[in-house]
């Protein structure tokens, strides 16, 4: 293989992936390795940073096998916004009551700190405006407070380094303790213009983090894509099979890498409403285990229940608002795999050689007369999808799932309908988030989807039909990996900025447009959707009186 390349590494919830990417954005090779998720009790999710780094090394070696290491110009890392804890000697510290040191990562979806998050919200600090007014248990301050209160001796007093997972990867690669502006601004309450706020950390009981200029959580900050340290250390280069000094870009949260991987695509001639419009008309929707809804603006926009605005957290000079759903792919798996007919579905999928969701989509086609009729099969079946709480736009971690319209049926038809209703509920949740952002001043006209669920044709079409917006799918479906490679390209100085690299490396694959015949159906479905939450809160209130 000739020419030169960049490597993108993406650490997701359940796997590590790497890609070898050409300067024009083509993914020449990809590799994937699973990583374990430990669930010692309800709402606790833990991982091992040692295993994660090992899988990073394995995947990078696989995609660069046979490639002259001198041809790899830069590498970029992204990861989930999980919390990594190390001691003074950079050894893993247990984040669990069992004292298992190898499990030193509190995952992003861990909700153990729900009570701490509620107490932080009750402080009413002005800084909470940056997180939609409500502190989420999915970002770092509540998790840190939980560790201090529940593991004071075994973890808190021994911990010297708290990293967001993307920053841990940068440190392993370069030895630099600098943090990415992306992670600190979005998950740690850092301000791009004002830095850390001492009054916030003191108010929530974490004043000890202020010591030594916040050395335990980050005293040096660099912009996404900036070259970190002196590139790969000798040890990291040996681990990864690359050359010492290879440029390493300041890391990104995985959703932000997805946004960078899709938003810059040229839409000329596609007759989309965002054509000839700035990037502020586009929303990136990164759909995997969870979903993130990323929109940028030229001026800061405060959206109740939506994280941000964050200056330059994803794109330089633009303010980012980040909505999201805590469980999307995970919810679909929960609904489908827990059904009595799942084994029958699994057997059919194995026999046909199809993925289970492709098989379900086909089954729904067989149950309907046409595409319009298919989505109306759930006229009397409705779901509120917040089985793991509502991240946006309600910011209600106490919200739970609701299903209206169940029967005694345990057939494959029943499973298919529940699956369809779940897809629609997730899409209606996206509509809810977009509505909140629009009310606050965003003007979103086109969706750009990526992530694992973007490969599900019915998920994509349902989003177009529910929101009434066209959906753009990237030519390279692994857009998160592409986004990671973009920051590697920026670090190498082959591209002078992230926007330049986005234009060079992102391309449109396919456009999915809404079906106007379903507009009335989804208007009514959305009205029911909103009432499900209202009724849930009424029921809770009645029982608590």
UniProtKB/Swiss-Prot annotation:
It comes from the Eukaryota. Keywords: Kinase, Transferase. One of its GO terms (molecular function) is D-ribulokinase activity. GO terms for cellular component: cytoplasm. InterPro entries: ATPase_NBD, Carb_kinase_FGGY, FGGY_C, FGGY_N, FGGY_RbtK-like. Its EC number is 2.7.1.-. It is an enzyme of class 2 (transferase). GO terms for biological process: pentose metabolic process. The keyword Kinase applies. Belongs to the FGGY kinase family. This is FGGY carbohydrate kinase domain-containing protein. It comes from Danio rerio. The gene is fggy.
